[in-house]
Design a protein with these regions (language model features):
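The DNA-recognition helices of helix-turn-helix-type DNA-binding domains
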Residues: 27-28, 111
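Polyanion-binding surface elements
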Residues: 1-19
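Short helix-start
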Residues: 6-7, 29-52
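Phosphate-binding site recognition
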Residues: 54-500, 512-517
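Short beta-strand
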Residues: 31-34, 426, 519-524
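Structural signature of nuclease core domains in nucleic-acid processing machines
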Residues: 476-597
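Short, charged/polar, Gly/Pro-enriched secondary-structure boundary elements
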Residues: 45-52, 445-449, 540-542
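Residue-level detection of the helix-turn-helix DNA-binding "recognition helix"
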Residues: 21-26
Length: 597
């Protein structure tokens, strides 16, 4: 049989060598093999239509077998190697939604689970199989319990409990081999039947993991692997819909029975967005190893790396779109690894490379809404600084809990970070195991999410457009009317507590101009720091400078105070940066505030 190298095949098919290498990895050439680092491809495996034949993208696919056999699959199987190298008793992976958690957990299930099917066929062409017998000897050797709570999104505790109970029952039914087991006692089979037929109480359900692991251990003679995917989805629902204590109490007992001091457990895996250690769900569980977005371990296995995105673009013949895909969907950093949002990347390529905010429609953005609704003036100003492309430095607590959103101002940034709305630009480890971090908005997609939530939550959209029209037309009376009308409808008498509040409010109202201006806040220019500057992105529109004054004194004249703000712009030469940038027309605006005036 004659073999060709990648360069020869690329020339014959009229595609790049890199694309041929990618097709080899994907198994598109039957019989292709790697020899001394070079792919050798059977000549009879090459046909002209191969250059056009491409696997579909796995949009909405979380089934590992289906993904690897019928779709373009990004190989994440070395996660198995890294786990087996250290083998903690229970591993918790915390990542944002739609970053591949469920797919990876199903991969672990297929790898470890002992079944009648030879499931090694799904791994023989993957990277894990090249790592040697130390790793492959674990394939297909364990009974596995697998539960995913990703769809437990109910509005009441009663509905939530019912759905969890059904999921537990279905997992018992999946292990139908226990029904005819020769090693189980009559009583144990009766217990199995009660769960499989969904005839259990809430207390029974809390013992479900412990019981099923006992039965499987006894039947197979091997300890169990327990996998719980998206364990905190029902906890978030509990916070949003006022059954938080009920779900936390249930989960505490449920996990304690299955994962703490369970002699029938080989090892366990959990995924979620939050660690929630403070909630005592994992109280006293000293066998738990948490892997957060700040940790270096496993950093490349959730989401796509730069190289994986380049390979994918190459496979689909879209190499020229790399910079655009970086601008829109890159920017995350897990540990020290640069990561792209995988859901958005595959949707972008499938949607003919038209960029838009794919991720925002995949789940609730209520966290942002709640943060905005309860934000202090300082928090509001910081959120708008982030929206304008600035970084802020803040304490990050990776074990943040949902009720702290309103009570702990530092928790806001921790929530936004672990949920995928912020990226880490730099980390400064603290003695308590947490971090001080420089954080920023990761990419254009998330800017759209912020803008949508900020404007919608405060009902600003139409008002913002009108206010900006008044600014552009230099209509001071209309601007005053619109601002007062907005404040009357949108803020309480307690909100206007300091100048920082009004500063943040104005930043938010200017956010709609982000596609025409670089919006800057509290930056040095001339002899001091301006409040807000709008640096035009085109030469044919004016630049803007805003200076704000605030008073509580009802006797003080607001017009005189606004004049002082305007004079400060000139005295401090705040227009220096705009003039140095070649901006010819500069509009200076001084505004004074008192309460809702």
């Amino acid at each position: 049989m004659d073999y060709l190298f990648c360069g020869d095949v690329a020339q014959r098919l009229g595609i790049t060598t890199r694309r041929v290498q990618q097709m080899c990895k994907q198994g598109d050439f039957q019989g292709a093999k790697k020899d001394r680092g070079l792919w050798r491809i059977p000549e009879n495996a090459i046909s002209e239509d191969l250059s056009e034949k491409k696997k579909p993208l796995p949009i909405g696919v979380s089934d590992f077998k289906a993904a690897t056999t019928s779709y373009y699959y990004v190989d994440k199987t070395l996660l198995i190697r890294d786990f087996l190298d250290t083998k903690p008793m229970v591993s918790l992976f915390t990542r944002p939604r739609r970053f591949g958690k469920t797919m990876n957990m199903d991969m672990l299930r297929v790898f470890f689970e002992k079944t009648a099917e030879d499931t090694s066929i799904y791994f023989r062409d993957k990277q894990i199989w090249q790592c040697g017998d130390f790793y492959t000897q674990h394939q297909g050797q364990y009974p596995v319990i697998f539960l995913t709570f990703k769809d437990v999104k109910c509005l009441t505790w009663e509905e939530t409990y019912q759905k969890i109970r059904i999921l537990i029952s279905l997992e018992f039914m999946r292990h139908s081999e226990l029904e005819t087991s020769q090693t189980l006692t009559t009583y144990e089979k009766e217990q199995y039947h009660r769960f499989a037929s969904d005839k259990v109480t809430e207390v029974d359900c809390q013992m479900g993991l412990q019981l099923l692991s006992l039965l499987l251990h006894k039947h197979f003679g091997k300890e169990c692997v327990i996998i719980i995917d998206e364990y905190d989805t029902p906890i978030q629902q509990g916070h949003n819909y006022n059954f938080y204590s009920e779900i936390v109490n249930f989960m505490r007992n449920f996990f304690s029975g299955g994962l703490k001091d369970n002699s029938h457990l080989a090892f366990g895996f959990l995924t979620g967005i939050l660690r929630v250690a403070k909630e005592s769900i994992f109280s006293d569980m000293n066998n738990l190893k948490t892997n957060s977005i700040l940790d270096e371990s496993y950093s490349e296995y959730f989401g796509f790396t730069k190289e994986e995105v380049q390979d994918m673009l190459c496979y689909y013949g879209k190499e020229e779109k790399y910079q655009e895909i970086c601008d829109w969907y890159d920017g995350y950093r897990f540990g020290n690894t640069e990561i792209f949002n995988p859901w958005s990347v595959i949707n972008y390529i499938a949607d003919k490379c038209f960029p838009k905010a794919f991720w925002q429609s995949t789940g609730s953005n209520e966290i942002i809404g709640e943060i905005i609704a309860s934000a202090t003036p300082e928090t509001t100003e910081n959120l708008y600084k982030l929206l304008c492309g600035e970084k802020i430095t803040t304490y990050i607590d990776t074990s943040v809990i949902y009720p702290e959103i309103q009570s702990n101002p530092y928790s806001i940034y921790s929530f936004l970070l672990v949920a995928g709305y912020l990226k880490v630009a730099a980390t400064y480890p603290q003695n308590d195991g947490n971090f001080m971090c420089d954080v920023a908005i990761p990419n254009k997609e998330i800017i759209f999410v912020y803008e949508k939530e900020v404007l919608n939550r405060t009902n600003q959209n139409n008002t913002s457009i009108s206010i900006n029209q008044a600014i552009f037309s230099r209509d001071a009376k209309m601007l005053q009317f619109l601002l007062e009308d907005f404040m009357l409808k949108s803020i309480s008498s307690m909100d206007g507590a300091n100048e920082g509040f009004y500063h943040g409010m104005m930043l938010g109202l200017c956010a709609i101009l982000g596609n025409r201006y670089r919006i800057r806040s509290n930056r040095e220019s001339g002899l001091g720091r301006f409040d807000i500057q709008l640096m035009p992105l085109a030469n044919d529109i004016p630049g803007f400078l805003f200076e704000f004054k605030y008073t509580k004194d009802a006797r003080e004249n607001l017009e005189s105070l606004a004049d002082k703000a305007l004079q400060q712009i000139d005295d401090k030469k705040y227009d220096t940066e705009l003039r140095n940038a070649g901006v010819k027309s500069i509009i200076k605006i001084g505004i004074a505030f008192r309460g809702k005036n």
